[in-house]
C-alpha cells in the first residue's frame, strides 16, 4: 500500500503545483496535451522562439502527455480542463465534434504562411467523414498530425508471407502462442470485420466503409467468433511491448500499427532479425490523429499558431524521423523525403501527394500504394455500441485482469477525479481573489 500511496502522490502533487504555478501567467502559457513519445522535443522547444518571430509575443509551453484517449476526453468533458491544444484520435474527434467540445481554429496568420494548406487532400477528405452533420466542415476544427494503418508484422525467417496474406492465416495452428494482438478493440474489430464479411464485400453487398462505420450485433458476433477461434495462437494482448518481442525474435507475428511496425523493423535490422509489414488482402483500417482546440482553451491564438507550426515541412520531417509515424503533410519536401531509392518496388502515391507521385520508391509501411489504401476504411466512434464492443472484448480476452491491475486502474481514476476537484477549487479561489482586488480598487 505504501508503494500505491507514493505512486498516487507522485501523480497528484505535480498537478497541484502546476495548477498554482501557471495560474498567474496563463495568458502567456500554451498548454499542449499530446500522446507520450509522439513529438520531436527539439521541434516542441523551438516553438516559443518561432512564435515570437511571427507575433512579437512571448509564450511558454506547458507540455503534458496522456496514454489513453478516453482519459484525455474525461478531463476536458467532465473536468473542463483548459488545455489549449490536444491531439486525439479520429473517433474521439468525431465524438468531441458531436458533443460540441471543440472550437474553430483561427487560420488568419497575418504575414505567416498557412502551412495547414499542405495537409494532403486525402487526409482532409477522411477527416470530413467524421462530420456530425452536413453543415460541419471538420477542417475548421481539426488539422491532421499523423496517420497510418493496422496490419500484420511478421518474422520472415519463421513465417512465409503466402501463409498470412489473408487475415485468416492468423488462425493457423502452427502459430499457436506466436501471435501478439493489439489490446485495442476498435482497431482489431475494424480489421477483423472486413475479413468476416469478405464474401459480402466481393459480391458488392456491402462496402468496407459501411462495415466499419456501422457496428451491429451480428457484426460483433462474427468478429468475436474469429477472435475466439484464434485464441490459442495469441501470446498476449499488448499496446506497446509487442514490437519489442518481435525485435527479439520471441514472437512470429503481431497485428500492429504501422508506426510501431516500422520502429520494430528498424530495431530488428540492427540485430540481424528481418521483419516485414503489410495490409491483409481483405483490408484494414486507416487511422488518423489530429490537432484540435477544446472549448475550454484559454490561449487560442498561440494554439492556432502551434498547429500551423507543426505543419511546416521541416518540422513534419523531424517528427516523422523521431517517432516513426507518418505526417499528413504532403508537400514536395515530404515527397522527396519519402522517395527511398533503396526500395526496389515503386508505389502509386497520387492519392496522397497528387501528380508526380505515380511511381515512388516508398516504404510500404509508411505509404501503402493506391491498391492497398483502397482496401482500408476509416475507424469511427462506436456510439451506443461501445459497451457491447467492450463486453465482446472482455469475453475474448477472458476477463483476465489481475486484482492488482484493477486496484491500480481504480486508483488512477480516483487521482484524475481528485486532480479535477483540486484544480476547480484553485480556479475558483483565483477568480475570487481577482474579484476582491477589483472591489478594493473601486474603494
What would you call each of these model-derived segments?
Residues 4-22, 416-421:
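Sec-dependent N-terminal signal peptides of Gram-positive bacterial secreted proteins and lipoproteins
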Residues 23-99, 401-404:
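Early extracytoplasmic/lumenal segment of secretory-pathway proteins
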Residues 33, 38-41, 97-250:
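Extracytoplasmic ligand-binding site segments that recognize negatively charged/polar headgroups
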Residues 45, 67-104, 114-138, 262-268:
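Pocket-flanking alpha-helical
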Residues 66, 88, 181, 237, ...:
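Short beta-strand and adjacent tight-turn residues that come in two discontinuous sequence segments
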Residues 232-296, 337:
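Extracytoplasmic/periplasmic substrate-binding proteins
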Residues 360-443:
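Conserved C-terminal helix/tail region of periplasmic/extracytoplasmic solute-binding proteins
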Amino acid at each position: 500500500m505504501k508503494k500505491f500511496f507514493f505512486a498516487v502522490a507522485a501523480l497528484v502533487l505535480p498537478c497541484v503545483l502546476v495548477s498554482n504555478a501557471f495560474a498567474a501567467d496563463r495568458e502567456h502559457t500554451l498548454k499542449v496535451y499530446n500522446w507520450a513519445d509522439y513529438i520531436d522535443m527539439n521541434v516542441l522547444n523551438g516553438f516559443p522562439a518561432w512564435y515570437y518571430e511571427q507575433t512579437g509575443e512571448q509564450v511558454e509551453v506547458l507540455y503534458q502527455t496522456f496514454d489513453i484517449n478516453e482519459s484525455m476526453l474525461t478531463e476536458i468533458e467532465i473536468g473542463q480542463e483548459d488545455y489549449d491544444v490536444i491531439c486525439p484520435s479520429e473517433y474521439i474527434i468525431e465524438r468531441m465534434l458531436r458533443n460540441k467540445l471543440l472550437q474553430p481554429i483561427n487560420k488568419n496568420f497575418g504575414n505567416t504562411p498557412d502551412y495547414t494548406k499542405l495537409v494532403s487532400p486525402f487526409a482532409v477528405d477522411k477527416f470530413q467523414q467524421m462530420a456530425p452533420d452536413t453543415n460541419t466542415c471538420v477542417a475548421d476544427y481539426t488539422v491532421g498530425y499523423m496517420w497510418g494503418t493496422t496490419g500484420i508484422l511478421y518474422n520472415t525467417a519463421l513465417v512465409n508471407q503466402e501463409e498470412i496474406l489473408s487475415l485468416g492465416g492468423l488462425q493457423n495452428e502452427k502459430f499457436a502462442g506466436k501471435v501478439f494482438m493489439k489490446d485495442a478493440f476498435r482497431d482489431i474489430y475494424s480489421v477483423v470485420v472486413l475479413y468476416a464479411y469478405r464474401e459480402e464485400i466481393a459480391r458488392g453487398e456491402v462496402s468496407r466503409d459501411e462495415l466499419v462505420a456501422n457496428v451491429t450485433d451480428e457484426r460483433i458476433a462474427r468478429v468475436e467468433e474469429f477472435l475466439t477461434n484464434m485464441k490459442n495462437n495469441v501470446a498476449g494482448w499488448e499496446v506497446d511491448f509487442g514490437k519489442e518481442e518481435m525485435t527479439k525474435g520471441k514472437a512470429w507475428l503481431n497485428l500492429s500499427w504501422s508506426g510501431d511496425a516500422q520502429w520494430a523493423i528498424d530495431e530488428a535490422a540492427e540485430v540481424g532479425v528481418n521483419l516485414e509489414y503489410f495490409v491483409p488482402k481483405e483490408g484494414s483500417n486507416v487511422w488518423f490523429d489530429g490537432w484540435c482546440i477544446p472549448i475550454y482553451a484559454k490561449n487560442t491564438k498561440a494554439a492556432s499558431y502551434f498547429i500551423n507550426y507543426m505543419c511546416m515541412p521541416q518540422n513534419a520531417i523531424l517528427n516523422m524521423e523521431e517517432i516513426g509515424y507518418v505526417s499528413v503533410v504532403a508537400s514536395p519536401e515530404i515527397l522527396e523525403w519519402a522517395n527511398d531509392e533503396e526500395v526496389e518496388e515503386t508505389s502509386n502515391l497520387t492519392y496522397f501527394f497528387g501528380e508526380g507521385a505515380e511511381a515512388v520508391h516508398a516504404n510500404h509501411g509508411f505509404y501503402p500504394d493506391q491498391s492497398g489504401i483502397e482496401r482500408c476504411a476509416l475507424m469511427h466512434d462506436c456510439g451506443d455500441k461501445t459497451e457491447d464492443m467492450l463486453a465482446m472484448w472482455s469475453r475474448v480476452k477472458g476477463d483476465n485482469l489481475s486484482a492488482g491491475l484493477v486496484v491500480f486502474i481504480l486508483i488512477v481514476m480516483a487521482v484524475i477525479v481528485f486532480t479535477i476537484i483540486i484544480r476547480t477549487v484553485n480556479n475558483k479561489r483565483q477568480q475570487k481573489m481577482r474579484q476582491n482586488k477589483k472591489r478594493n480598487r473601486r474603494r
